[in-house]
Amino acid sequence: MTITPQNLIALLPLLIVGLTVVVVMLSIAWRRNHFLNATLSVIGLNAALVSLWFVGQAGAMDVTPLMRVDGFAMLYTGLVLLASLATCTFAYPWLEGYNDNKDEFYLLVLIAALGGILLANANHLASLFLGIELISLPLFGLVGYAFRQKRSLEASIKYTILSAAASSFLLFGMALVYAQSGDLSFVALGKNLGDGMLNEPLLLAGFGLMIVGLGFKLSLVPFHLWTPDVYQGAPAPVSTFLATASKIAIFGVVMRLFLYAPVGDSEAIRVVLAIIAFASIIFGNLMALSQTNIKRLLGYSSISHLGYLLVALIALQTGEMSMEAVGVYLAGYLFSSLGAFGVVSLMSSPYRGPDADSLFSYRGLFWHRPILAAVMTVMMLSLAGIPMTLGFIGKFYVLAVGVQAHLWWLVGAVVVGSAIGLYYYLRVAVSLYLHAPEQPGRDAPSNWQYSAGGIVVLISALLVLVLGIWPQPLISIVRLAMPLM
């Protein structure tokens, strides 16, 4: 197949991030300079973001049989790049206090971002698997980056072993699907899988095994066991990437698979997904209730958020509104998570051993860092789905989609889960305004709002509030991505 200039323009974000990986690698080999390599990484990610405008001008196209570049791919590529950019920004002050090699951190984040972009463009089960591996493998190193801490090393080993097991399930499931359908392309799967074929035992087994593999990557119940330990053990900037970029990219490709290949038409698969969604919403929220570690709390809450998104995925067959719901919800989840994990990163920077992740560390934060406490409050309210925040718009969309598709018991689960979530999110918010302890522990630098990480956190808070009050610009962007499907 001949690659035309149009194809190259369509692949610009992927090519720019790939080039940045090579440049940073050569820079590290030539001379270790933390500031230089961080700057090169941020410039590369910003250039990839800007290049999305040129990709939009080129229009939708199938670049190779493995990749389709369209509005949908651009939306999810943009979200992954924003999450990667924020991760690098939060990592810089954290790494300033880190005594071992700093520069490889950015290299691993860039490679993981490359995997996320590949997933956003994937149109074939082969590129889906390649993208998932490309985003997972660097995370093994990132999770255990603070390897002198027992907890970080333990989290890395857990994630590596369980991720390898999940990948084997995913690969075996794909093999069974290929054996039955004779093709791995999403579009060809849609053509080959007629109504009768979807109930073939081999095909059901194949998709079942794929759900196990993808369920692990998205930390859905009952494949969630790694989530709280890994979120707690990983450095705060890495937890940011885990909670945002990896989840968004993988959920995006699952959406495309369900859109082209009518997997959701099978009643058996719909029932399994509904049970997983119900269990994830209820279990994730109930387990978060008793947490005293903010990273574990956010880990369990991410399980419930993916459960809410699964409701929209199950309703995908009922119309375009569910695609819109997922886009808006993921944007809200991205900015809220960036803000929440950003505050934890600022409190934990520079590296001085374990992160400031105990809830006690945030008690009375308002009295010495009022703006930071206000930012954290906004993020908690958004994650809880309180009106006037972007989180509310996303949750309202999910409820509307659930009602439209008559998924009544899942709508009930969303309502109950949101009520439980309200308690533990407000518990975090209230603790920020209590009397500060006499001997405060970790604290953010006094000039945090002038640092790059502080600016990212403030912008996230502003977007959560502004788009919560006036969501039309975001909804318009998400709708632009839909007709090109």
UniProtKB/Swiss-Prot annotation:
- Cellular compartments annotated: Cell inner membrane
Q: Under the GO molecular function aspect, what terms does this record hold? A: NADH dehydrogenase (ubiquinone) activity; NADH:ubiquinone reductase (non-electrogenic) activity; quinone binding
Organism expressing this protein natively: Escherichia coli O7:K1 (strain IAI39 / ExPEC)
Biological role stated in the UniProt entry: NDH-1 shuttles electrons from NADH, via FMN and iron-sulfur (Fe-S) centers, to quinones in the respiratory chain. The immediate electron acceptor for the enzyme in this species is believed to be ubiquinone. Couples the redox reaction to proton translocation (for every two electrons transferred, four hydrogen ions are translocated across the cytoplasmic membrane), and thus conserves the redox energy in a proton gradient.
Question: Which ranges does the record mark as transmembrane?
Answer: 8-28, 35-55, 71-91, 105-125, 127-147, 159-179, 203-223, 235-255, 271-291, 297-317, 326-346, 373-393, 408-430, 455-475
Q: How does it sit in the membrane?
A: Multi-pass membrane protein
Q: Which PANTHER family match?
A: NADH DEHYDROGENASE
Cellular component, GO, one term = plasma membrane
Quaternary arrangement and interactors, per the entry? NDH-1 is composed of 13 different subunits. Subunits NuoA, H, J, K, L, M, N constitute the membrane sector of the complex.
**What's in the keyword line of the UniProt record?**
Cell inner membrane, Cell membrane, Membrane, NAD, Quinone, Translocase, Transmembrane, Transmembrane helix, Transport, Ubiquinone
Note the superkingdom of the native organism: Bacteria
| GO BP, one annotated term | ATP synthesis coupled electron transport
Q: What is its EC number?
A: 7.1.1.-
Protein name per UniProt: NADH-quinone oxidoreductase subunit N
Family assignment?
Belongs to the complex I subunit 2 family.
Provide the catalytic activity annotation.
a quinone + NADH + 5 H(+)(in) = a quinol + NAD(+) + 4 H(+)(out)
From which lineage does this chain's organism come? Bacteria, Pseudomonadati, Pseudomonadota, Gammaproteobacteria, Enterobacterales
